[in-house]
UniProtKB/Swiss-Prot annotation:
It holds the Pfam family CDP-OH_P_transf. One of its GO terms (biological process) is phospholipid biosynthetic process. Disruption phenotype: Cells appear normal, no effect on flotillin cluster numbers or size. Gene3D superfamilies: 1.20.120.1760. Keywords: Cell membrane, Lipid biosynthesis, Lipid metabolism, Membrane, Phospholipid biosynthesis, Phospholipid metabolism, Transferase, Transmembrane, Transmembrane helix. It comes from Bacillus subtilis (strain 168). It is a multi-pass membrane protein. This is CDP-diacylglycerol--serine O-phosphatidyltransferase. It comes from the Bacteria.
């Protein structure tokens, strides 16, 4: 049973890879579906690990790799595919910056703050969701500004509530307040 949380995390990783694959074939809607499916799996992997008493350093590292692909690389490729490509140099720079800031944010989280009650910097799954939604404006200027803003928020010192942790605790205990 200890392998179940890692299998859920690997499912998240696979969703990220399939989102990227979909984008290579210009299948935008499938890419979005895979990103949101990865988000669903990401919500439950930690909960499953705690419930099965299977929390591990390896699981935490796998989760970061999966999150980087599903919420760092795939959304930036989506943003580039739908609108940022029309801004030749700026568009690729924005997409790269977002992915790099996502990588930095995940690394910093693993080292410094995994036990804090709030996040320092915007969590990458939330940033990824915002970027996916923002991509559907199909406005390259707005998307470039939004991508840079989300990049900054991920590496900022701004505190964000730990919604996933509170939701998981409430779900695990069977109560919703």
């Amino acid at each position: 049973m200890n392998y179940i949380p890692c299998m859920i995390t690997i499912g998240n990783f696979i969703c990220g890879l399939l989102a990227i694959h979909s984008l290579l074939y210009h299948n935008i809607h499938s890419a979005v579906l895979f990103i949101f499916t990865g988000m669903f799996l990401d919500f439950f992997d930690g909960m499953a690990a705690r419930k099965l008493n299977a929390v591990s350093d390896m699981g935490r590292e796998l989760d970061s790799f999966a999150d980087l692909v599903t919420f760092g690389v795939a959304p930036s490729m989506l943003a580039y595919s739908v609108a940022l490509y029309t801004l030749p140099f700026i568009g690729i720079l924005c997409a790269l910056t977002y992915s790099i800031c996502g990588m930095l944010r995940l690394s910093k989280f693993n080292i410094e703050q995994s036990k804090l009650p709030t996040f320092i910097g915007m969590p990458i799954p939330f940033a990824g969701m915002c970027l996916v939604i923002l991509s559907f404006t199909y406005n390259p200027i707005l998307l470039a500004i939004g991508t840079c803003g989300l990049s900054y928020l991920m590496v900022s010192k701004i505190k964000f509530p730990h919604f996933k942790k509170h939701a998981a605790e409430n779900l695990e205990s069977g109560r919703w307040n």
